[in-house]
Amino acid sequence: MFSQKFAFSCSLSWLSFVLVCAVSAACFVPALEAQENPYIVAYDHNLEEPGSLEVEYFSTFGTQRGGPDFHGFWSEFEYGATAWWTTEFYLDAQSTFGESTIFTGFRWENRFRPLKTEHFVNPVLYVEFENVNEADKILKEVEGHDVESDYAVPNSVARKEKDREMEFKLILSRNYKGWNFTENTLAVKNLSNNPWEFGYALGASRPLTLKGAAHRCNFCLQHLIAGVEMYGGLGDRYSFGLHNTSHYVAPGLAWNLPSGWTFRIEPTFGLNDQSHQFLLRWGASYEFSGFGETVQNLFKGHRP
């Protein structure tokens, strides 16, 4: 039964990702060779190339001591609006084993880079509107007093409670001798009468080698980027700090193919009793360069 549920939820979550990639490929949009980092929670200062579209799928398999295991999954559609602005739309869903598979909501994210060139530290401003229900289990970030027991509420109960939030991040990132170092400070305000909540994420990553291969290849070491991230909650306005918060550390690996595909995997380990003991995250993405120009040309071609 477990394997059947898991296979069904994986098949469902992959469907939208595969369909979008197939439609986009049919439009003959060339792929852009890019080097994506392995982070799934933390952000660095790199934005999407202007006019490029990246379609992404991610999964989180989670274990729980107080409830059934779950599979949270989401699709992302990331577009480079300008050189300093990237916008992204999320669709979230989850399967809780022994209960149900449900759609949990959507998110609209925007990242703004105020400094055009590379600096010692590169800031990015992050703003997101989130409209999900309490059954959401993608764990895209940890905020406030989010703890493992929050995710044990049955889907039939949790899905009735709506969360509409504004999320803000200050991203400080630097590339140095092949390394990337990043720090994210998180502040979240529920649009109801709840206090501000806070969190953080830290990350460091580096390609396995900085030497480029003499020929095009898929398995060259420069296409593999290893890293680690750590993230957790910092309480809220009335009880700021580490008390009754959860924290995680996650080593990860990204494999960037010259064709435009990127694959990520990230085992995640809870650092205290309030955290999930183990999460397994993985994802795939495909980047289409010149997507905006292709769409414009399609519309121009239909003008009378």
What positions do the PLM features span?
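Glycine-centered signal
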Residues: 1, 29-32
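Bacterial N-terminal signal peptides
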Residues: 11-27
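N-terminal secretory signal peptides that target proteins for export/translocation
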Residues: 1-12
